[in-house]
Regions:
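N-terminal glycine-rich FAD/FM-binding segment characteristic of electron-transfer flavoproteins
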Residues: 1-339
């Protein structure tokens, strides 16, 4: 009752990174609230799944193991969470802002007449004063995300309804094991009690999972281009520089919208979150939604001819100049000094 819950996405028998990241954050939230962290695993052949989950500080793992629960389909997983939450009455539920999370989250929140904030970039605990009603709500979940095209950062609260639900993209939170020997309780539920047979009406006949074309999230060096790159050809310079530095190339939303780069290279609140050791921003102004996806980089270098570009305020080093001037010189330098 009144605990923090995390829904675990599972591919085969492997828990997704985004879910493990949310367990790390959920553990911190539970500590602040003085409650337990619980997780929900729904899939097939899940024996031993607790070995992946409990080390993140999970006090209770709810396991729903049945052939009809993998691959994911909407109705069975919705019934699992809706009926479990009616029993357990969590105060917070977190899930990944993935294809599955974007389908499952709204279904569950609607059925429980709760609210949901999508694509949060930060989650905190705090108080809220409703001056109109003259009420003060303590220990609410601050669901923080950019809004209005990234021009402001909104803090959203859900004072009255439970659970407070939020989705978070992969990479936004850090994944950290709490204790490899953490002792938590594992509960194997009777799936038939929670999921009616009619929920299995949709069956997945075949699946095709494509591998990622690049490793933007895990790259130690990321070179990102913005609208200031001017064209798709401008991005060719970044790929040439990336080849010399053994880096990956990313892009801002403006550059992707302009057709300069593919969407899977987009960095920011509506793209990938990265934490490289070195982040080189080329022709990027630095809207809030972009900064949300790279602000925890080790060293940030901004190449920009606008001294007042917002990204310069968080950059460790600023190179004032056009990308057409600076990047060719960098390429020439690294080519001449590489072995």
């Amino acid at each position: 009752m009144n605990n923090v819950f995390v829904y675990l996405e599972i591919e085969g028998t492997t828990v997704a990174d985004v879910s493990l990241e949310l367990l790390t954050k959920g553990r911190k939230l539970a500590n602040q609230l003085g409650c337990q962290l619980e997780a929900v695993a729904a899939g097939n052949n899940l024996a031993g799944i607790e070995k992946q989950v409990l080390p993140f500080g999970v006090d209770k793992l709810h396991v729903f193991d049945a052939p009809g629960l993998f691959p994911y389909t909407s109705l069975p997983h919705s019934s699992v969470l809706i009926n479990l939450f009616k029993e357990e009455k969590p105060q917070i539920c977190l899930m990944g802002a993935t294809v599955i999370g974007r389908d499952l989250g709204p279904r569950v929140s609607s059925a429980l007449t709760s609210g949901l904030t999508a694509d949060c970039t930060s989650l905190e605990i705090g108080n809220h004063e409703d001056k109109k009603e003259g009420k003060v709500y303590e220990n609410l979940l601050y669901q923080i995300r950019p809004a209005f095209g990234g021009n402001i950062v909104a803090t959203i609260v859900n004072p009255e309804h439970r659970p407070q639900m939020a989705t978070v993209r992969e990479g936004v939170m850090k994944k950290e094991i709490l204790d490899a020997d953490y002792k938590g309780e594992v509960i194997n539920h009777d799936v038939a009690k929670y999921v009616p047979e009619t929920d299995y009406v949709v069956k997945v006949i075949d699946r095709h999972v494509e591998k990622a074309k690049h490793n933007l999230k895990g790259a130690p060096i990321v070179i990102a281009g913005g609208y200031g790159m001017g064209s798709k050809e401008g991005f060719d310079m970044l790929f040439e520089l990336a080849k010399e530095l053994h880096a990956e190339v990313g892009a801002s939303r403006a550059a992707v919208d302009a057709g300069y780069a593919d969407h899977d290279r987009q960095i920011g609140q509506t793209g990938v979150t990265v934490r490289p050791k070195l982040y080189i921003a080329c022709g990027i102004s630095g809207q809030i939604q972009h900064i949300a996806g790279m602000q925890e980089s080790g060293i940030i270098i901004s190449i920009n001819n606008d001294e007042n570009a917002p990204i310069n305020t968080i950059a460790d080093y600023v190179i004032n100049g056009t990308v057409e001037e600076v990047i060719p010189k960098m390429i020439k330098h690294y080519k001449s000094h590489s072995k």
